Amino acid sequence: MSEEIILEARDIWHSYEENDRFSLQGLDLKVKKGSKVAFMGANGSGKSTFFLCCNGILRPQKGDILFHGKPVSYKRKELLALRAKVGIVFQDPDKQLFSASVEQEISFGILNLGVAKEQARTEVEQVMEELEIVPFRKRPVHALSGGQKKQVSIADILVMRPEIIILDEPAAALDPKHTRMVNEMVDKLTEQGITVLMATHDMDYAYAWADEIVLMKDGK
């Protein structure tokens, strides 16, 4: 793990509706490059809201998100570049997956970045092999099991070679077998030097896995 700060939140405030309570209230946070950070806290404590701010899906009403020391820009071109480097795997994979087949799904994001078809095909093939997706590459996404959908969700992000992957409760609603499978995939990500932020309610796993643990309450 490096001492370099790859992601920083400076006095972040966010509310979903005007005059509503703030989901994030003056959050300050620094994340080191290559670190494994577990986020814990009750539902509604601000974990998911912070994650959505990290890659520009949400824009804070106040404060700054910094990536490599530079404030996030909300112009379309810069946001697309940021989202290629800071990827989110949602708690519910059905919110992320939409293409007909697994292979098409994984190909969509990298092709949207303007990568040449041949290079994209090579990258997709490599990621499918890494995450053991090849056996069901031609299957329709809607026909996959929960664990397989989670594999494809992670592949969606990994194929773009991100610097940060955010996992919002990656083992939620999975049986023990698929939970172990997802945890093994997370270990592979960290072995590649990718910075991983993960929300989890599993205290034992968080303490065993993480370099740092962030405890959130009331958006702080």
Residue ranges of predicted features:
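H-loop/switch region of ABC-family ATPase nucleotide-binding domains
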Residues: 200-201
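Helix-to-loop junction immediately C-terminal to a conserved catalytic motif
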Residues: 55
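The feature captures the beta-strand-to-loop junction immediately N-terminal to the Walker
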Residues: 40-42
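Conserved ABC transporter NBD signature motif
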Residues: 63-74, 82
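Conserved ABC ATPase "signature" region
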Residues: 118-136
